[in-house]
């Protein structure tokens, strides 16, 4: 009598993890570049529940010096602030399938691990963006000095310039707009409605480009009623622990099957 042992079976951990790593690497490269460095996705081992860092707050400026004065000057002190990155654990799955479901379609069973590995990479990227937009909203909404109220429907592109005014003469440092698709299409609609001349199908539009020359990240994970104007490194999502993947046999059901699940942790740092 023959008995099947582990070496007779194939559990495709490597297939799934390879697909995950390849897909994530592509997403990281494209996303970091396409966001103008405003939203950074990174990998770094971080211990504990928080990453705390202190920084100096100075903001000094030049002042006129009276060359004929012998008066005393008043010393100024520097300040300090603290940035805290918070860990957020995530999970994926579990997903299961019978081997029969793939064999009956003439497909290799390892295809299950490949498609799941690619999907978990996409799911983690989308989840990272959800974490980023939630962190941005919490941080910015608590700072009334960085919030303006406007509407594309009534204010048009002035909605964006009102936000840029908050940066003063440093407005050029804005690297990226982040907005919901509904807000983006409101801007497109406003640009179309603002055409100043049309004849024989040729349209001339007045004013600046719809987003004032800044790239836009359009994601429906962003709040529908908020537009973020971000500086470089505005938010950093760090995969702070090695993600775990598990492919496993399902041996206690009518049909033999395999399953897959994953988990991981990210740190969220807001500028």
Language model features with spans:
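N-terminal "assembly arms/tails" that initiate or stabilize quaternary assembly
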Residues: 1-86, 236, 242-243
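Extended, compositionally biased alpha-helical segments that mediate assembly or anchoring
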Residues: 2-8, 239-271
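Short helix/loop capping segments that flank catalytic or ligand/cofactor-binding pockets
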Residues: 63-65, 186-189, 195-196, 238, ...
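Short acidic, glycine/tyrosine-flanked loop/strand segments centered on an H-E-D-like triad
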Residues: 78-106
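Helix N-cap / beta->alpha transition motif
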Residues: 96-102, 178-183, 220, 229-231
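Alpha-helical scaffold segments that mediate packing/assembly in large oligomeric complexes
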Residues: 99-170
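Extended, solvent-exposed, turn-rich assembly/linker loops in the middle of proteins
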Residues: 138-214
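Extended serine/threonine-enriched, polar tracts that run as long, contiguous segments within proteins
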Residues: 202-234, 238-249
């Amino acid at each position: 009598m023959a008995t099947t042992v582990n070496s007779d079976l194939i559990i495709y951990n490597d297939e799934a993890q390879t697909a995950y790593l390849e897909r994530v690497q592509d997403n990281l490269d494209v996303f970091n570049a396409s966001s103008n460095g405003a939203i950074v996705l990174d990998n770094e081992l971080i211990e504990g529940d928080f990453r705390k860092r202190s920084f100096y707050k100075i903001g000094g400026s030049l002042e006129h010096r009276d060359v004929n004065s012998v008066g005393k000057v008043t010393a100024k002190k520097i300040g300090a602030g603290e940035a805290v990155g918070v860990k957020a654990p995530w999970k994926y799955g579990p997903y299961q399938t019978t081997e029969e479901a793939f064999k009956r379609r003439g497909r290799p069973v390892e295809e299950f691990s490949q498609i799941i590995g690619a999907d978990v990479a996409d799911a983690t990227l989308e989840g990272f963006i959800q974490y980023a937009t939630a962190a941005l909203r919490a941080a910015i909404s608590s700072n009334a000095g960085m919030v303006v109220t406007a509407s594309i429907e009534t204010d048009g592109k002035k909605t964006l310039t009102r936000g840029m005014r908050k940066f003063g003469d440093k407005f050029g440092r804005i690297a990226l707009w982040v907005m919901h698709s509904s807000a983006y299409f409101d801007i497109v609609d406003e640009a179309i409605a603002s055409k100043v001349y049309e004849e024989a199908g040729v349209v001339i539009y007045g004013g600046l480009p719809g987003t004032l020359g800044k790239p836009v990240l359009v994601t429906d994970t962003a709040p529908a009623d908020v537009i973020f104007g971000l500086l470089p490194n505005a938010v950093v999502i760090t995969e702070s622990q090695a993600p775990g993947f598990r492919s496993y046999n399902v041996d206690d059901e009518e049909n033999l099957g395999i399953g897959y699940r994953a988990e991981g942790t990210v740190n969220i740092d807001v500028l």
